[in-house]
Regions:
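Inter-lobe connector of SF1/SF2 helicase motors
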Residues: 244, 248-280
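Conserved helicase motor
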Residues: 66, 89-100, 122-127, 154-157
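Walker B catalytic acidic pair
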Residues: 148-149
Length: 280
């Protein structure tokens, strides 16, 4: 599978083509790209290619609740080629008859030739209810599962993290998308990479991972003793271990990006807003 005959809906920048070529048919991959570098476009082109080569029939996108409308209304319509027929369904905790009918169509009916796209907010994975519906979707599809803004699953103790990690093996392809640098919060990587595969970083537990890369000091507070993280170590080793399944790009590396455009927008303030503004 290659990009030679693939027809984009929106023309990619060079860094997007490079990233797509690198991640194209990989079962698991991490896109560590700064905000503004078009992670969603890369992901949707990747899904389109896999669908056209009959590798997937479903796409599950997990995203913060505030981002779901952007995926639903903007990103999918903008970047997914029009030639690809799709059904898009956004998770609703309170199911209407219309929603239930649309969901059943996805998981029960023959949808050959149609890419089923299920958008679920990451917060919903704290509930068993959402997990059951997602599990059914994954079981009934050859699926790509994506966690957008994957730092939302950085806490290994959180219910959402545990549930997503448990569901992950049901997906044929897995992706995480985030823009944070390793040096800023290296311990946050553990759960995100564990979602992709438990074996990626070579540690059987978060505590073993922390012992390797965190510098700690024993502290006491009353009768309570604990290990306080005071710094980090071996970060070059950690970055090296990520190279086989990820790509890291910053805006300064992407020379073909257009220049920033600043637009002035003037708004009329209400009397209440003018009063508040005057007190600043």
């Amino acid at each position: 599978m290659n990009l030679q005959n693939y027809e984009y809906k929106t023309e990619p920048y060079q860094h997007q083509t490079d990233t797509l070529e690198l991640s194209l048919d990989s079962p698991l991959f991490a896109l560590f790209l700064e905000m503004g570098l078009g992670k969603s476009k890369i992901l949707l082109d990747n899904a389109a290619l896999l669908f056209e080569h009959q590798k997937i029939s479903g796409l599950l996108i997990v995203s913060p609740k505030g981002n779901l409308p952007n995926w639903d209304v903007h990103e999918i319509n903008k970047h997914l080629p029009d030639r690809i027929q799709r059904n898009v369904l956004v998770w609703q905790p309170n199911h209407t008859q219309r929603w239930t009918t649309a969901y059943k169509k996805m998981v029960e009916e023959d949808s050959t030739g149609v890419l089923n796209i299920f958008l679920v907010n990451v917060e919903a994975f704290a509930t068993v209810k959402a997990c059951k519906f997602v599990e059914e979707f994954l079981v009934t599809h050859d699926a790509m599962m994506v966690v957008d803004e994957s730092t939302t699953i950085k806490n290994p103790k959180a219910k959402r993290t545990k549930h997503l990690i448990k569901l992950a093996p049901l997906a044929d392809y897995r992706r995480i998308l985030t823009g944070f640098p390793v040096t800023k919060a290296p311990l946050d990587l553990y759960s995100q990479c564990y979602f992709l595969s438990p074996n990626l970083l070579g540690f059987s537990s978060f505590f073993a991972f922390r012992a390797r890369y965190a510098i700690t000091q024993s502290r006491t507070m009353g009768r309570l003793s604990f290990q306080q993280i005071t710094g980090f170590q071996r970060l070059e080793e950690l970055q090296e271990s990520l190279k086989d399944f990820s790509i890291r790009k910053t805006k300064t590396e992407c020379l073909d990006l257009p220049a920033k455009v600043y637009i002035k927008r003037y708004v009329e303030l209400s009397d209440e807003q003018k009063t508040a503004y005057g007190t600043m």
